[in-house]
């Protein structure tokens, strides 16, 4: 445990509460002392929603410590059950209340046995000392999905549907896995307080609709736990973000043989890779259905991208080089004519950014995606790419290998700040903390990942996924870099940007003072190198133990650097 005034990923109970509050008609009860109950305020402040946050705090106070928590927790669960009749009540401790080592599962069992209980009650199965917010969210979502699918299996078993087949798999699984008539997909991992998640969900729906694929379920955001039994009916699952949803997809693949797409469609190239992965899955399902003597052709021929030349059901006479589903025309059309990003990356405006240095830091999905866009699609030199998702470090290294000079895996914002100060990039792409660091160093920053503040929960449509997302990212990248002659024009025409240069040290210790003459001389230095001159002068002053920078010190530093 460590004391910090900034955390990229919060404690585990925040992840559980984010998942619980994303579902409809699900209530969370947090067993915690005062001070751990800030989630309601945080979500109400950031998310632009009309509904109240469905979280109640069962406060651990001195009375609870004296008498025990069981009576109070059970009473709170029963009260919320009677007042709001939610479909599910989730009980979660926090890292603080976990110290009490109470048997919360026993509390849940007691509350579930109440005669008047109409809600399911579930204890979040999360180790609060070993996992962070994102890992806990992923685990909680998988736990809820597993709970309701196992519950549906039990219901079917009691109805006499279940038995055991030759492969030692229950026929209940097969019964649950009856697919939708037309190709369909589940979108897993869209949830509250995510980075542009609602906009990304709309863009994914539009993308799938263009491919003739229906949406089966979207979870957890806006989903109902009563509909979780329908998850196996989809043909495949889409996991737009690795951080949340991957465990659920792996469970569904293992139990119901459901394939999943875990390629995040961020950027022109990865969007095409994602679509081709969907194409591969649909073609595989089609051929398997033919071998199983299931006639799906009458349904699939209505898909706009179904190849009508596939007319043989005989595997011996069928041409295996011809794909039933072929999305290449859609990819080419979107890339060349619909998305503006591919054209913009070859324009003279974007070519002006070629070779400029950038630092990228964020969650694993967004940081890896933006790194590849900058390096592959826009010709920008990524001098450092990093993530705070230390649990996914191996995947991240594999993704960004060859696209950046250095890789930084840390959840300590001071290390990130020191790296940025050392590398002196032209722009930063990161979280809210990197925006603060950029302001202190006078380096522009584009926000590409959570955690973020209110301005990155926009009312307007701003996805980061899919082809519209590529346009948004291209705008963000271009607008994050300082324009060529902007500083000079503002100075020549006495523009509004006349603030004096600020100290660019991330530490408040040993700050140097500039006298008026030195500052005046510094202001005469061209804007695009002024920051570098200032940093070199301060470095020279510190090396020589000079507390105040005068005109003589400025010139001495210049001579020392030139020598």
Swiss-Prot record:
Belongs to the ChlB/BchB/BchZ family. One of its GO terms (molecular function) is 4 iron, 4 sulfur cluster binding. This is Light-independent protochlorophyllide reductase subunit B. CDD domains: Pchlide_reductase_B. It is found in: Plastid, Chloroplast. The keyword Chaperone does not apply. Substrate binds at residues 484-485. [4Fe-4S] cluster binds at residue 36. Keywords: 4Fe-4S, ATP-binding, Chlorophyll biosynthesis, Chloroplast, Iron, Iron-sulfur, Metal-binding, Nucleotide-binding, Oxidoreductase, Photosynthesis, Plastid. It holds the Pfam family PCP_red. NCBIfam families: DPOR_BchB. HAMAP family: ChlB_BchB. One of its GO terms (cellular component) is chloroplast. Protochlorophyllide reductase is composed of three subunits; ChlL, ChlN and ChlB. Forms a heterotetramer of two ChlB and two ChlN subunits. The keyword Calcium does not apply. Its main location: plastid. One of its GO terms (biological process) is photosynthesis, dark reaction. It catalyses: chlorophyllide a + oxidized 2[4Fe-4S]-[ferredoxin] + 2 ADP + 2 phosphate = protochlorophyllide a + reduced 2[4Fe-4S]-[ferredoxin] + 2 ATP + 2 H2O. Its EC number is 1.3.7.7. Its cofactor is [4Fe-4S] cluster.
């Amino acid at each position: 445990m460590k004391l910090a005034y900034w955390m990229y990923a919060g404690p585990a109970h925040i992840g559980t509460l984010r998942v619980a509050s994303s579902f409809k008609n699900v209530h969370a009860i947090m067993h915690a002392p005062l001070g751990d109950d800030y989630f309601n305020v945080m979500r109400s402040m950031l998310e632009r929603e009309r509904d109240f946050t469905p979280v109640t705090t069962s406060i651990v106070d001195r009375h609870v410590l004296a008498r025990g928590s069981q009576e109070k927790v059970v009473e709170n669960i029963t009260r919320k059950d009677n007042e709001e009749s939610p479909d599910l009540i989730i009980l979660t401790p926090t890292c603080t209340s976990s110290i009490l080592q109470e048997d919360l599962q026993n509390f849940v069992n007691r509350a579930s046995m109440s005669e008047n209980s109409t809600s399911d009650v579930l204890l979040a199965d999360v180790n609060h000392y070993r996992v962070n917010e994102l890992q806990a969210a992923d685990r909680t979502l998988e736990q809820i999905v597993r709970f309701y699918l196992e519950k549906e299996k039990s219901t079917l078993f009691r109805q006499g549907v279940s038995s055991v087949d030759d492969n030692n798999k229950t026929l209940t699984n097969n019964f649950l896995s009856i697919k939708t008539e037309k190709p369909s997909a589940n979108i897993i991992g869209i949830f509250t307080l995510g980075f542009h998640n609602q906009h990304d969900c709309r863009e994914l729906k539009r993308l799938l609709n263009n491919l003739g694929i229906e949406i089966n379920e979207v979870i957890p955001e806006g989903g109902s736990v009563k509909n979780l039994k329908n998850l196996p009916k989809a043909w495949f699952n889409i996991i737009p973000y690795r951080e949340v949803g991957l465990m659920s997809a792996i469970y569904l693949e293992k139990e119901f043989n459901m394939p999943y797409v875990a390629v995040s469609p961020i950027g022109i190239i990865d969007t095409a890779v994602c679509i081709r992965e969907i194409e591969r899955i649909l073609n595989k399902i089609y051929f398997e259905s033919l071998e199983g003597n299931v006639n799906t052709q009458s349904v699939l021929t209505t898909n706009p991208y179904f190849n009508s030349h596939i007319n043989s059901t005989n595997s011996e006479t069928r041409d295996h080089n011809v794909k039933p589903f072929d999305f290449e025309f859609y990819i080419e059309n979107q890339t060349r004519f619909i998305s503006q990003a591919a054209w913009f990356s070859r324009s003279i405006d974007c070519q002006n950014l070629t070779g400029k240095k950038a630092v990228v830091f964020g969650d694993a999905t967004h940081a890896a995606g933006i790194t590849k866009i900058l390096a592959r699609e826009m010709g920008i030199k990524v001098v450092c790419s990093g993530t705070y998702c230390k649990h996914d470090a191996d995947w991240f290294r594999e993704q960004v290998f060859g696209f950046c000079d250095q890789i930084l895996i840390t959840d300590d914002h001071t290390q990130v700040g020191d790296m940025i100060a050392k590398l002196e990039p032209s722009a930063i792409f990161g979280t809210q903390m990197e925006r603060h660091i950029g302001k202190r160093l006078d380096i522009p920053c584009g926000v590409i990942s959570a955690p973020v503040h209110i301005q990155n929960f926009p009312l307007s449509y701003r996805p980061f996924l899919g082809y519209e997302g590529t346009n948004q990212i291209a705008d963000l990248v271009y607008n994050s870099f300082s324009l060529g002659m902007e500083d000079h024009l503002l100075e020549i025409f006495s523009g509004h940007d006349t603030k004096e240069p600020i100290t660019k040290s991330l530490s408040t210790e040993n700050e140097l003072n500039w006298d008026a003459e030195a500052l005046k001389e510094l202001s005469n230095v061209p804007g695009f190198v002024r920051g570098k001159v200032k940093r070199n002068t301060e470095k020279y002053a510190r090396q020589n133990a000079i507390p105040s920078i005068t005109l003589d010190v400025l010139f001495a530093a210049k001579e020392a650097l030139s020598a």
